[in-house]
Regions:
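Short amphipathic alpha-helices and their capping loops
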Residues: 2-64, 88-135, 162, 214-263
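Extended, hydrophobic beta-loop-alpha segments that form or line the acyl/peptidyl-thioester binding
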Residues: 97, 101, 196-197, 308-315, ...
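A short N-terminal helical cap/helix-turn-helix that marks the beginning
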Residues: 103-104, 199, 203-215, 240-249, ...
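Gly/Ser/Thr-rich phosphate-binding loops and adjoining beta-strand/alpha-helix segments
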Residues: 38-41, 47, 66-85, 158-179, ...
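A short, small/polar-residue-rich loop/turn motif at beta-strand boundaries
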Residues: 3, 8, 31-45, 79-95, ...
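Active-site-proximal acidic secondary-structure segment that organizes catalysis
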Residues: 27, 41, 47-48, 130, ...
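Flexible, Gly/Pro-enriched loop and linker segments at secondary-structure and domain junctions
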Residues: 43-50, 56, 68-74, 100-106, ...
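His-Asp-centered acyl/peptidyl-transfer active-site segments
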Residues: 2-4, 9, 63-70, 98-99, ...
Length: 604
């Protein structure tokens, strides 16, 4: 998960009991061995339709493992915080934000999928207490990591509030660490960082003004308005255009095997010099830090993928809208950014790419208010028509405007510039992901790289290439042709029988395996032909019911995870009992043939 990368261990040390402190919790609290139960009494309540972000994440919760969806983070604790102070601050946090008190009762359908959200005005929450014993600071950090990894794998009860779980690491009544696990239907990554800001103020005794951001109920009403529905419809058209014409698999290269890797390598890079260079590039190109970093990331990714065009998924996309920047909830909808990276000519440079990135990212962000059910159906429909299924391989998540600098400043000072720190592997099904954590004063980002595409040494080269490119671009326009020398990265290879078909690089051996595996024993032999960008599958069978439509349906159903293959454009079905020599296929009469796509097969 990305949750651990949000806080990045910004712990504040405590070594003694606070002077004059009394550890008395205010009200509605019971404590048993290792567990505190307290009540919250929030303002407001009610029910309404789901927000589009809630709907999206509830579908993901029903499909994916808890550790892929829940969010774990370790929050900084102000020095001298007692258990009583912490519990009261957490109570105030729950009472302050409706999203944390929102539940999702089962809907009337057969699958029970929720159709509405309900905000609980009051209820109970629990706080686990774990003594740190004689551990030092590093040992406490390790314990916090261990507890977070265990808790993040536990699913949330969607019918019960709150949407957060809390664990305090304590020495007597003094709190050393706060481990928080969040349900992604209640909070996204940016919301977590905003909650950390509130927590720090509340734990320090501050009185906060009422929350001024839109509540999930208010957001849902806006999304269901005529204006909201028009925006959603426009977003769907944008997605259809990109899914139909853009690359379905940006990292279609040697080494890609069906299915995702067990773990995705993760590292954290910090550099003050790179932040100064980034600022210089922004001044010179009149672009913001997000656009510049996205352009650099895209240029390096395209170089590694040995292609000139990419489709990038940007998380927290709706956070780019000022009205939702401080929303506490889950927006959790992707922006789909189709980018011509280049180089389109020998003199194409990073400045020009930054300009293209600004336009492409604005278009993607503007069209990121999505109905998840319709988007998933669109993905299926395009896969059926195109024969290639979109894979979210390259991802960017810009959290830099939301993470308080105090979280970064609380870490130990870097020992080098740039400093690279390896993090625990993450269970994320991506090929390459950039999490931008900070841009002002220090450039800080977390890079996740799939081992099928990047060995660990290459992942580190990629990360170190970002400040190298910024340093070169700070001095003036940087030709894209110089990326190879700057990065030290070699482009990925495509050995064997690869063909460029539309926007995709396709491994014909993978297509043959796809068709054979999809049909199984229904096919006695399979042959694949390629001519003028079209793939034709010839299938020998004794199955009288096997038609082009049935074959195509089976092949498309087997596509997920096979990112180097696509379904053939045309199928010819031959009735024949056994294997056939290659020279026999052209003379064999076809029983039926056609595209298999929502059109009648031509019977022979």
């Amino acid at each position: 998960m990305i949750g651990p990368l949000v806080a990045s261990r910004p712990h504040l040390a405590q070594t003694c009991e606070p002077k004059g402190a009394t550890d008395v919790m205010t009200h509605d609290v019971t404590e048993t061995e290792g567990l505190i139960t307290a009540r919250f009494h929030g303002v407001g309540g009610g029910s309404g339709p789901l927000t589009l972000g809630q709907d999206n994440m509830l579908r993901c919760i029903g499909r994916d493992r808890p550790e892929q969806i829940n969010r774990e983070s370790v929050w900084p604790v102000p020095e001298g915080t007692t258990v009583a102070t912490a519990v009261d601050a957490l109570r105030a946090l729950l009472e302050r934000h409706e999203s944390l008190r929102t539940v999702f009762p089962p809907g009337p359908g057969k699958d029970g999928f929720p159709e509405r959200q309900e905000v609980r005005a009051e209820g109970e929450f629990t706080v686990a207490l774990v003594p740190v014993g004689d551990r030092d600071g590093a040992g406490i950090d390790a314990l916090a990591d261990e507890l977070g990894r265990a808790d993040v794998a536990v699913p949330f009860d969607l019918t019960a509030a709150p949407r957060l779980r809390f664990t305090l690491l304590t020495e007597g009544r003094l709190v050393h660490r706060l481990v928080v696990v969040g349900c992604h239907a209640g909070v996204d990554g940016v919301a977590v960082t905003l909650l950390i800001r509130d927590w720090l103020a509340l734990a320090a005794g501050a009185q906060l003004p009422p929350a001024g951001s839109r509540t999930p109920l208010e957001l849902a009403a806006l999304e269901q308005s005529p204006q909201g529905r028009r925006k959603t419809a426009a977003a769907l058209k944008h997605w259809e255009s990109v899914l139909t014409a853009g690359p379905s698999s940006s990292f279609s290269v040697d080494g890609m095997t069906p299915g995702a890797a067990e773990g995705t390598a993760a590292l954290l890079l910090r550099s003050r010099t790179a932040a100064a260079d980034l600022e210089a590039v922004c001044r010179r190109t009149a672009a913001g830090p997000s656009a510049v970093l996205l352009a650099v990331f895209a240029a390096l990714a395209a170089h590694r993928a040995a292609r000139t065009d990419l489709v990038i998924s940007a998380l927290s996309a709706n956070r780019q809208r000022s009205a939702l920047a401080d929303h506490i909830g889950t927006l959790a909808q992707d922006a789909l950014i189709a980018l011509e990276v280049g180089p389109s000519a020998a003199d194409d440079d990073l400045d020009a790419l930054i300009g293209r990135t600004k336009v492409a990212s604005f278009t993607g962000y503007w069209h990121s208010t999505l109905n998840a059910d319709k988007v998933w159906q669109l993905v299926e429909d395009v896969a059926e028509r195109r024969g290639a299924r979109f894979a979210r391989q390259i991802v960017v998540n810009d959290l830099s405007l939301a993470i308080p600098e105090t979280l970064s400043d609380a870490r130990p000072a870097p020992t080098a510039d740039p400093e690279v720190q390896w993090l625990p592997d993450q269970p994320l099904p991506v090929r390459l992901m950039l999490n931008i954590l900070r841009t002002a004063g220090s450039l800080e980002f977390a890079l996740l790289a799939c081992p099928q595409v990047f060995e660990r040494a290459d992942a580190e080269r990629f990360a170190r290439a970002v400040p190298a490119v910024l340093a070169a671009a700070a001095a003036g326009p940087l030709p894209l042709t110089e990326l190879a020398a700057l990065s030290g990265l070699s482009p990925a290879t495509r050995t064997g029988d690869w063909q460029r078909i539309g926007a995709d690089w396709i491994d014909l051996a993978a297509v043959r395996a796809l068709v054979a595996d999809a049909l199984g024993t229904r096919a006695t032999a399979v042959d694949l032909g390629h001519q003028d960008g079209r793939l034709t599958a010839r299938i020998a069978t004794t199955d009288q019911d096997l038609t082009p439509a049935a074959a195509h349906h089976a092949v498309v159903a087997a596509l997920p995870g096979r990112e180097t293959a696509m379904a053939p454009h045309h199928y010819a079905v031959h009735h024949h009992p056994g294997p056939l020599p290659l020279l026999t296929w052209p003379t064999l009469p076809a029983h039926a043939e056609g595209s298999g796509r929502a059109e009648a097969a031509v019977a022979e």
